[in-house]
Amino acid sequence: FAMLLSACGGVKYELKDGVLYGDGKEASGTFEFKSGKNKVKGNFVNGLPDGVFEKYYSDGSIMLKDAYVGGKNVAEELYYKNGQLMGAFSETEALRLFYENGNIVMSVNLQTGETVVYHENGVPLMAILGNSAVIFNENNEMLFRIDNGQPVDLGATLNQLEDGSYELVKDNKVLAKIDANGQIGTYLYSTGEPLMSFNSSNNLSEILFKDGTVLFKSDGTNFTLNYKDGKPLYEAKGENWKFFSNDGEEIISNFDNITDIKKLD
């Protein structure tokens, strides 16, 4: 597509298939423009983005930094309005997401596909890689493990209760509760609150904060990661990702609806 950006000093700029042109020629220099309602500043070399592009919240604080090499996006950092790092990824490093207090909440290895979700205290909560997965409580005690689709015996005992449901018990402590059909279950924090629920009949799973607010929700294909107040931080639907600030503003990293171009040098 071609998008008219602006006429600055008599020069007409347009972005076509990722290349910036000025009066039909590949443009070079530092430019400032709007992407949607957000201001962006960065450098183009022979029409291609090159170097670090900064995108700003409406209050002027940095929303994200995108690193480009010859038009290729090689790394990205997202920020909260207070300057705290929200997330980062690159071609060689995993995607990492953080809460506003700096604690890591999730990492995704973009090469292997391994996904790790963390407890509030920074201890791994769940790690998934292919058909293998492991779940820990907040004390780093393993509650569940499956390797290549096969459950691993952790020394726990499955006890059936009078109503037909089950409790998974280890060292006189209940690790999980499972319904009579074995399809719906809940793993527990060390203090007894629901930690993770699953429903094998529809692939729905949820991870909960201790107060019951949903941290993570997935149907096996799509998933949502939330802030502590239940508002979305990160959504993945198929191959589409979305990030949100803690006040609900969507953070968009691509250059859409470009307007108000200004050449700075």
Label each residue range with its predicted role:
Residues 6-265:
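Glycine/tyrosine- and acidic-biased, solvent-exposed loop/turn segments at the edges of beta-strands
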Residues 1-4:
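Bacterial N-terminal signal peptides
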